[in-house]
């Protein structure tokens, strides 16, 4: 079987490539000319440069190939301007799908890696309820809006295209850079949290996302959408407490600030990012993400229909991630 993975040099994409190789697939990694191949060193990997900003170029680049499976994991999570999210996440998906259709490529399955973020701050009344597939998305970030627009485009094609959408919650694990910043701060004995209202959060380890991807490729139902988490719900301090435990620090100062403090910090982070041309991790989208109180989601459909069973509870996943950060000189 021949598989194409977009975003192959990214956090999730690189793990998908590794699993495809493990399963003996002819594995093609779509990367940009400027992308790092640090985690794509296996000599069995075939590389292809795809220009997701041009449907015409995509057709030319894909024309010599017939892929059985395509996993679209490419996407922008931080951009200097909101419209850039749409160019990458929405238009990039649209152009890729159109190129596949115009070429008449007989793919068996197209898996789109979306996000729980497309739903925004819904079901925020306590006690919090799980976000379900029948809920109406109300994305509150440019990232979430762009991913939702990509989903809508896939839905508009209908049954003529064999797609499945995965909506993971916060994905963490070795190589991940955003949660790593929290670990860096805690190593310096500081844990910064915002908001005093209860916050229910969910996580999913990267290998569990990979598990779901290949289950979807194997026997998912066309047009279905699945939430992914480890099946548990945590309070906002759980992640930092586990990091602190694994780091073995003798003490940690937890600073909890009002939401308005975060608003000021992210405002200036966004401003400085645009001035310097390098987007800060603390930006306007991050403000809405950190402000959101309910990240519960219903993974029962993924378990029932895909056979998805998360193998990495938070304690195990954090232990593995921190060990990797230490072993690789990140911490």
What are these regions (language model features)?
Residues 3-23:
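N-terminal Rossmann NAD(P)H-binding glycine-rich loop of SDR-like oxidoreductase domains
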Residues 46-91, 120-121:
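NAD(P)H-binding glycine-rich loop region in Rossmannoid oxidoreductase-like domains
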Residues 138-164:
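Active-site Tyr-X1-5-Lys
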């Amino acid at each position: 079987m021949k598989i194409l993975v977009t975003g192959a040099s990214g956090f999730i994409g690189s793990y998908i490539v590794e699993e495809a190789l493990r399963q003996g697939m002819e594995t093609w990694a779509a990367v940009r000319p400027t992308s790092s191949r640090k985690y794509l060193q296996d000599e069995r990997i075939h590389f292809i440069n795809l220009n997701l900003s041009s449907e015409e170029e995509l057709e030319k680049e894909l024309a010599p190939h017939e892929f059985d499976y395509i996993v679209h994991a490419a996407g922008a999570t931080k951009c200097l301007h909101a419209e850039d999210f749409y160019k990458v996440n929405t238009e990039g998906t649209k152009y890729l799908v159109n190129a596949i259709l115009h070429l008449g490529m007989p793919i068996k399955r197209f898996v789109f890696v979306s996000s729980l973020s497309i739903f925004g701050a819904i079901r925020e009344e306590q006690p919090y309820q799980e976000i379900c597939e029948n809920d109406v998305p109300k994305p509150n970030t440019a990232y979430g809006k762009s991913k939702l627009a990509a989903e809508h485009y896939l839905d508009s094609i209908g049954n003529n295209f064999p797609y499945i959408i995965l909506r993971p919650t916060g994905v963490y694990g070795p190589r991940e850079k955003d949660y790593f910043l929290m670990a860096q701060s805690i190593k310096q004995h500081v844990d910064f949290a915002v908001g005093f209202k209860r916050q229910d959060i969910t996580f999913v380890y990267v290998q569990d996302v990979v598990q779901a991807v290949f289950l979807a490729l194997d026997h998912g139902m066309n047009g279905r959408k699945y939430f992914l988490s480890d099946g548990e719900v945590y309070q906002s301090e759980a992640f930092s407490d586990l990091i602190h435990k694994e780091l073995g620090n003798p003490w940690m100062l937890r600073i909890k600030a009002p939401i308005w403090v975060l608003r000021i910090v992210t405002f200036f982070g966004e401003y400085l990012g645009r001035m310097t041309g390098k987007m800060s991790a603390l930006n306007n989208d991050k403000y809405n993400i950190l402000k959101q109180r309910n990240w519960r989601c219903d993974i029962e459909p993924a378990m029932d229909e895909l056979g998805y069973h998360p193998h990495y509870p938070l304690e195990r996943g954090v232990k593995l991630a921190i060990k990797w950060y230490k072993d690789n000189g990140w911490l």
